[in-house]
Amino acid sequence: MYKRQLVGSFLLALPISSATGEAVPYIDALFTATTSICVTGLVTVPTYSTWSVWGQIVILFLIQLGGLGVITVMYGVMMGLHRRLGLGNRWMLQDVFNLNNISGIVRFLRKVLIGTLVVEGCGALLYMTVFVPGYGLRGIWISIFNAVSAFCNAGMDIMAEDSLCGYVFQPMVNLVTMLLIILGGLGYIVWWDVLRVLKNIRSQKLKCFRLLTLHSKIALTVTGILIVVGATAFYIFEYNNPLTMQDYTVPQRIWASLFQAVTTRTAGFATIPQEDLTNTSAIISVLLMLIGGSPVGTAGGMKTVTIAVLLVSMFATIGNKEDAELFGRNIPKQAVNKSVAVVSMFFIIASLSTILLSVVTDADVIDIVYETVSATATVGLSRNLTSMLNLWGKLIIIVTMYLGRVGPISLVVAFSTQKKNKNIVKNPTEEISVG
């Protein structure tokens, strides 16, 4: 992944990529390439005014590459060249996508690519109903860019410096953006599982939710809970905030609260200035950013299923139960171990990044935590700190974004390798005290 990151940075550092024709400083080109391929959305320079159309095309390609995953895009290229996918890549994709066998890998990837293009295309067409009247022909490019960025949970746009704050009350922009974010964040496994169930519903008249896999049940349930609880919390704590929602009507508060609850789940778009949020809302946003979206999707974060498994395991331990159960099914020990590893990794990365960033900047602690968690969970929301970072601050965030995106994937591969190569000889067990 770092090779594509470097290639992208070199392309963005070319004068042709700059709107002024003068080369952008390499550190900003590297930062932009990293935030694009990691689908984060934090930017040190305004995307809409700094980059030329060519530069924006490079950014969009990196976003699509990062959102879909390198192997998925590679398959698309190989399919176009009529080449076959290697057995090693098939095994890795089986683990990453959590499929039962490798026989359906090619078919699944084809569905992912086609489904992604269809959803992004529909989103772009809906955006055009708003952006073309407002921006003319340029609105077509803006619509395409926003659709890909929203679906890939990147949160980058080419309209203005204040993201979507000018569209806080625009129903179409709000609905399309939230829908694309949610669809991308739910993950491809949930997509096809829901479609499979809907087909069975038509033919067998069975209850929909009961037919879903455990993975889909957890992802959909946790996603719904986080959106409702998050939106309610933002509505309450921003109700009397003169800098955000105090002067809004009730419907406008609902729109703004819903969008904030959705976008903090690793999207990065904003309809209200993040630096104007109350400290309580900022802390809630940090928690939502850490949780993120669902596995095998375009979102980042620790993932909804990971948090659910960890909580269920915790309550099972407290209740002195041998197995963690959810929706009438036992959670595999391997899933519990993986969840602990992912959560631990995220907290370590975010903590170290926060400490290091606090050394090189004198910003408020809440702003630093917001920035580092946003980078770790590849969200892209900032309390106006990113553009003020010095060289060391930019390097810290670049590394944080990279680790936050690559780390979970590396853990999945590590656990899958461990599963296939179990040690026959084990060391003796000895009890220790914890807690």
Question: What does each of the following model-derived ranges do?
Answer:
Residues 3-435:
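Membrane-proximal intracellular helices of multi-pass ion channels
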